């Protein structure tokens, strides 16, 4: 009888263990999300601490399938050369270029990071992921022309923007972008700026190559089709992350990690809330999707080589800035025009309709309500966008490409972006356009929230994660020396340091096979 009872007990224990969470040995770093942010941070950490064990968890069957995918973003190497929303005009008429300078400095860091990876053969064939495409601003109407002229003049005080061309001459602008000028109403007041060193970037390709290089290391493990289901802090300040294997009957595995990075794009908010850290209190998200008109007609594509950005309508949010872009996606040239806003309660393109309602908590419902009241213009904009017909979209395109033909263009759905809503002492809650790193006080978990300028600033944003989460390590001579190898200008500003600007751009441009135009002293 005792033997029978013992056998039954053993069978019971074995049966329970099959259904219980399988536990694995601890890792140094767990990266949640298989996009460019996680890939960049993983690459940094592998180079700084080659002996550290790193795991990456991605819900889909491939990396770089959400916001990093070439079709899910505009592919602009954001340098503030053409994006008019990065400069603002004060009430006294002065032009504030501080944000434009910061954006440009950040992209120069990203270029250095990528150039270093080319040197190390981590990234291969720069033409597969970055190409020169001139960045242009194009406006019409007296007020907009006056704004662009003033913006151009203000930017010339920064060495980073020296060499930007400005013209109000229709013939000159036609040489730059013939499709924008052909069929345009004669006598229309127009102006344009042009920066030849602008770039088009395939962030998905960068991500795939970075992860591919990491995957060749014994210290790295990639888990595809795994979804994080739970995130709990342990008494020793490590984290136990429970995930389900979606390709294996949702079998659950737990991983213990010293440091967790939540780089899951639109999915980051829910995971941050799951962590329960007090720093996450009060954050909420508002999802906004986008679509573009696209053409691959070679007769059209070959006649446009530029990213042409316009000026957003009064009252419209920053993400509404229209642009006509030359793109290189998967080695093929494409023209895209947009974006046109779409709305879904999903936080990810491959997410759930319950993402938005499921993210509402007692701690963030107040900020969400207050942000909604204060952003009535955004609500009106979204409603207007959702009511657009294909004829309406083509009419918008013809403001930039007057002779565009309906049959050449089709609507493609891009990715989802989750804009940050956070507590505000004065307003109760504010909608914030940008990115923000949220880190636990002990640095054991960090999350990236928000969208624009996004992937263009992956390298500097992940540097800020290192500085917050590994403060003591960053201060060591060893990490300082390595960071200055990876990003030669690390710790210094390029703006108005002509020698440093020229040497840095020349170094990265040579490796990335980009044109380099030396900066000249201010006239």
Curated annotation (Swiss-Prot):
HAMAP family: MQO (MF_00212). It comes from the Bacteria. This is Probable malate:quinone oxidoreductase 1. SUPFAM superfamilies: FAD/NAD(P)-binding domain. Keywords: FAD, Flavoprotein, Oxidoreductase, Tricarboxylic acid cycle. GO terms for biological process: tricarboxylic acid cycle. Its EC number is 1.1.5.4. One of its GO terms (molecular function) is L-malate dehydrogenase (quinone) activity. It comes from Pseudomonas aeruginosa (strain ATCC 15692 / DSM 22644 / CIP 104116 / JCM 14847 / LMG 12228 / 1C / PRS 101 / PAO1). It holds the Pfam family Mqo. Belongs to the MQO family. Its cofactor is FAD. InterPro entries: FAD/NAD-bd_sf, MQO. It catalyses: (S)-malate + a quinone = a quinol + oxaloacetate. Pathway: Carbohydrate metabolism; tricarboxylic acid cycle; oxaloacetate from (S)-malate (quinone route): step 1/1. One of its GO terms (cellular component) is cytoplasm.
